[in-house]
């Protein structure tokens, strides 16, 4: 009986890490990594299905067509709801537009962390800069009333007449943010604008026990839900579709062009 083939590891007295037991080998010299590449044992057949390029292209085309159809339906719904005003404006059909803006604001604040402890307070966030630009553009055109402070109601809107906008599907309501917004605590709209305040809190900012005075967690826009759009923490002239059936998420429908 011939001696079994032994590798260098087993000759030193350690376990054999490079070869399988001789009963499972072919001649005692087959490498373990050669068996690991085949998924069906000794046959070496690959059981993973290969993706056909035609099917991949067809799936991509179907996804693009579905996205285009959804965008068309959203723009048509916005035009029907706003009475054609969305056609001359800049529609934003993405339902998470508020959340994306809040995340961009958070990234801008985090980018200033290397400047020091008080840098996020000295530099205005992206929403505040956009709000200031919109207010100055409207003031140059003579169409911006004086923005009241927080807690003071904005100018009252006239009662709806017979030419009121039709009821929205799903029991939604239109909400216009800015100085002309009515007092609607049920919708989370406080009316008027809120001046930009320092966040405070220092290094523990963002923690529920470490937040200092004047802190609004989550940025100026919050996460896009109803409790976070109250008090006028959003730029002027934004039109939202508030859908209670969708968990109270506010859908940004219309953003007028305010650049002078």
Swiss-Prot record:
Residues 104-130 are annotated as: Required for nucleolar localization. Residues 1-50, 108-219 are annotated as: Disordered. Keywords: Nucleus, Secreted. GO terms for cellular component: extracellular space; nucleolus. Undergoes proteolytic cleavage to produce a secreted C-terminal fragment. Residues 187-199, 209-219 have a biased composition (Gly residues). It comes from the Eukaryota. Residues 36-48, 116-154, 164-186 have a biased composition (Low complexity). The keyword Secreted applies. Interacts with C1QBP; the interaction results in nucleolar localization of C1QBP, probably due to prevention of C1QBP maturation and redirection from mitochondria to nucleoli. This is POLG alternative reading frame. It comes from Homo sapiens. The gene is POLGARF.
